[in-house]
Amino acid sequence: MSHTLTKLDLPTLQTELENATAQQIITWAAQTFGPGLVMSTSFGIQAAVMLHLVTSIVPNIPVIWIDTGYLPLETYQFADQLTGRLQLNLKVYQSPLSPARMEALYGKLWQQKDVESLNRYDQIRKVEPMQRALKELEAIAWLTGLRRDQTRHRQNLKPVDLQGNQYKVLPILDWNSKMVYEYLTAHDLPYHPFFDQGYVSVGDWHSSRPLMAHDEDERDTRFHGLKQECGLHLPLSPEAGQSLDSSAL
């Protein structure tokens, strides 16, 4: 059954939801979007918070995980642990271009250490699979765990907004690290294993490192400090949208 995009009064909703609790926002999203509601996870450092929060209210929600093929061993093990414990309805998506084929065609893009190469990498390994997942699952709205304290771009986000063809809903937008820690502790939920090694954010093995004293924020530990966003949470330009449909991917 096709899910129809509902036209919402975003300015009013953004004001109403600005002071709502995470649970209230998730409940609102479930009631508003019904089977058209999905969530995404990276199985990162604090992933258990959103997974527990959302599945406590919407138990069988489709959980999209983009497997880049370059995740650390510990991330795959952490994903398996949380999937079993929380009984996740996990939907795994990958690029149709295998890591070996991508490297043969473009080289090790992350080693080129320029933004253009990193953007191409993210487009192939993350953005295209996510857009395909949202389309195949007929998503109207997408729950994600972005927080304002993570990057400069995220400071200006709203609890609900339109990105491309889907609404994006951010229940823990105003949470800080202390609130995350308290939630994990209260519900006996695990951090990613790399937390104990000084990581505050983890993605692919080649583009993540522990937090250093000179880092201004946690996302400086990603992408060699050249960029803060992988592209999943940025508005698509017309050119980016067109490239997602390219058979070259």
From Swiss-Prot:
Coiled-coil regions, chain positions: none
Any one Gene Ontology molecular-function term assigned to this protein's record: phosphoadenylyl-sulfate reductase (thioredoxin) activity
UniProt key word Cytoplasm: yes
SUPFAM superfamilies recorded: Adenine nucleotide alpha hydrolases-like
Record field: catalytic activity: [thioredoxin]-disulfide + sulfite + adenosine 3',5'-bisphosphate + 2 H(+) = [thioredoxin]-dithiol + 3'-phosphoadenylyl sulfate
One of the Pfam families matching this protein, by short name: PAPS_reduct
Biological process according to GO: hydrogen sulfide biosynthetic process; sulfate assimilation, phosphoadenylyl sulfate reduction by phosphoadenylyl-sulfate reductase (thioredoxin)
Protein name: Phosphoadenosine 5'-phosphosulfate reductase
HAMAP family given in the database record: CysH
Cellular component aspect of the GO annotation: cytoplasm
Pathway in which this enzyme or protein is active: Sulfur metabolism; hydrogen sulfide biosynthesis; sulfite from sulfate: step 3/3
